[in-house]
Amino acid sequence: MSQPDKVLILDFGSQYTQLIARRVREAGVYSEIHPCTVTAKEVAAMAPKAVILSGGPSSVADADAPPFDPAVFDLGLPMLCICYGMQLLAHHLPGGQVAASTDREYGRADLQLLADTPLFAGLPQKDGHIVWMSHGDKVMAAPDGFVVAARTKNVDIAALANASRRIYALQFHPEVAHTEDGERILHNFLFEIAGLTSGWTMSSFLETELASLKEKVGDDEVVCALSGGVDSTVVAVMLHKAIGKKLHCIFVDNGLLRMGEGEEVAAYLREHFDLNLHYVDAAKLFLDKLAGVTDPEEKRKIIGKTFIEVFEVEAAKLPKVKYLAQGTLYPDVIESVSFKGPSAVIKSHHNVGGLPEVMKLALIEPLRELFKDEVRKVAVELGMPDFIIWRHPFPGPGLAIRIIGEVTEERLEILRRTDKIVQSELVASGWYRKVWQGFAVLLPLKTVGVMGDGRTYENVAAIRVVDSLDAMTADWSRLPSEILAVMSNRIINEVKGVNRVVFDVSSKPPATIEWE
């Protein structure tokens, strides 16, 4: 099968870079993000049909501005330069000029179209278009051969066009939802200017990937760590379709799962696929190692280390295994190559990252090109049930990081019952599919309450529900107060050990989605 047309996005550290990639893919065109440090020769070798330069927080005049090879402009490829990318264009090409702006623009701005350009074809004929700005510097003079295509109140040059070279630039962000007609502008660039074909679908991805997996594995065998989440389950089903009984799945029940979670996924896989499924009950081992531990980082490290130890023992029983399959997604890959470099570690990530080296296994990552929403589309293509496809993300350390303080069997049981009510009410009210994630947290404090004629002194539970696209940023969900009232009433009446419920109204940033 032929490879789909590819758009290369060069990342200069913008918070919106992944959003650009998502918007391009939503239009049916495959996109890849690469650091801005790639050379023109490397770009050409990747054979993209078009290039997009992202925005970024730097100034082109800074001594430590992101490195960039201006020869990229001479490759003859259609290019769209966004925000910092536009300033870069004016900085490097003859005739262009960039200066620091005294009037910084952040947020909504009114765009006036000045030139008839294919980039703005089909936009409504009106005086102003709302666009989203986020910049300090601005272009003072257009490079030779470029026409000024738009302006705003504070910026005389808000868009540039060179039709013969098929290079266009925007000072605003067409990828964000706040920009009116941003989708149309990107569509014009991809299909009218670059002439790309809309061939990136999850069915085409699946067809190509299954053939690739079959060829790569050959007669060898693969071990896959199942977590119960959608990513690892999709990986398992894909591999089973590609290599059948040469796949071995290991499900380690660490005792930190949601109510019925392990049994539910294991039952589905056993019922619908003739899988080699090894179910390991290691709950007591994990709880023993977590006894007395209250520090969240320590909890994560203990759980990660113990998982590797248990997985190693089980995988050693499978001597023919040569590959380890993981549910790595594209945002994980991007983070490792981003121009921003190693970010400050906010929390250690629990995954099986240490296993390939420890066990000397080659790695298979069938989903490493996909975003989370695309993984769900693959799951639909595979005919998987809704309860797996739409399951909310769940952290590797499980309920251990939703119990603030020490993890005990008693506290786990309280949290499981509380969380089950939150989940069931989200489903019953029709909100489960509307939000990114919803769950309960058990706090390390008790408060006084009254039940019947008696005084109580019980635990406090928090409800956390957020909206997000990719978990990189999130806002708290505006659940109707009626739903919160039902949740709270049920929790206090049905869960022994909780007498107070609070609702978390923090966004990410500054808070994180999980409490630990």
UniProtKB/Swiss-Prot annotation:
Chain positions recorded as ATP binding sites: 227-233
Matching entries from CDD domains are given as:
GATase1_GMP_Synthase (cd01742), GMP_synthase_C (cd01997)
Pathway participation: Purine metabolism; GMP biosynthesis; GMP from XMP (L-Gln route): step 1/1
Q: Which stretches make up the Glutamine amidotransferase type-1 domain?
A: 6-199
Q: What class of enzyme is it?
A: ligase
Keywords, A to Z?
ATP-binding, Glutamine amidotransferase, GMP biosynthesis, Ligase, Nucleotide-binding, Purine biosynthesis
Note the InterPro entries from the entry.
Answer: Class_I_gatase-like, GATASE, GMP_synth_C, GMP_synth_GATase, GMP_synthase, GMPS_ATP_PPase_dom, NAD/GMP_synthase, Rossmann-like_a/b/a_fold
Q: Which segments constitute the GMPS ATP-PPase domain?
A: 200-391
Q: Which Pfam families match?
A: GATase, GMP_synt_C, NAD_synthase
Reported EC number(s) for this entry are 6.3.5.2
Q: Which residues does the Swiss-Prot or TrEMBL record annotate as the active site?
A: 83, 173, 175
Question: Gene3D superfamilies annotated for this entry?
Answer: 3.30.300.10, 3.40.50.880, HUPs
Q: Quick one: a GO cellular component term?
A: cytosol
Q: Can you provide one Gene Ontology molecular function annotated for this UniProt record?
A: ATP binding
Which reaction does this enzyme catalyse, per its entry? XMP + L-glutamine + ATP + H2O = GMP + L-glutamate + AMP + diphosphate + 2 H(+)
Superkingdom of source: Bacteria
Q: How does it assemble?
A: Homodimer.
Q: What does this protein do?
A: Catalyzes the synthesis of GMP from XMP.
This chain belongs to the protein called: GMP synthase [glutamine-hydrolyzing]
Q: Which organism is it from?
A: Solidesulfovibrio magneticus (strain ATCC 700980 / DSM 13731 / RS-1) (Desulfovibrio magneticus)
Chain's gene name: guaA
